[in-house]
Amino acid sequence: VDALTRIAKVEIPEVNPTLGSKETFCYRNKLEYTFSCKCWITFEDLRSGREIADRNALGFHIPGAFDKVLDIKKCWLQDDLSNRIRLFVRQYALAKGYEFYDIKAQQGLMRTLMVRIASTGEVMLIVVFARPEQEKINDLMGAIAAEFPEITSLLYVVNQKVNDTIADQEVITYRGRDYINEEMEGLQFRIGPKSFYQTNSLQAYELYKVARRMACLKPDDLVYDLTLEIGRA
């Protein structure tokens, strides 16, 4: 609404109430974590006076500080499997001495970790490395596969570019399929590593129900989906 009225200068006579989500915890089907050798030091850390020996982090970027990452111990945005996977990968990489990425110096091995968990129960994990160190890659991917047999799509990427996007990168399947299945109202969708899908699956269904009701569709209507939000890639 703000973008339409303030930026586009579009007059909106009436704004309907926000359609709230019933689920406010563990509702996301996709999360992406970033590895960094420069963790964000919290106020609690500063007040404690403790020396922080481990500056590595696997978590979320800090707004306004692109090179700093807040290390996440427990995330409430996704199923707890996501927490277990993240903590396992973090601990394993540190134990093996795999360097967390330094985005300023463009150095290190471990870049990002993406977890997708579909409403069908299928799980996709994408590990992004900064260098083609195949022995280390195989070692970590093998450990993940052994620890988490529930992962149905285990993939990895070697991204040697400056930015983190993998849209133009080759995605390599280590185990399982190169997609997971998602379902909405009896319809099946194949979600690939580069696909876009509404991150709140349950709320997406509610959104589409509203759109369908407002469109007043009839059984013989021909409907075009021009947003192209879903596509296997």
Where are these regions (language model features)?
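Accessory RNA-recognition modules of RNA-modification enzymes
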Residues: V1-R232
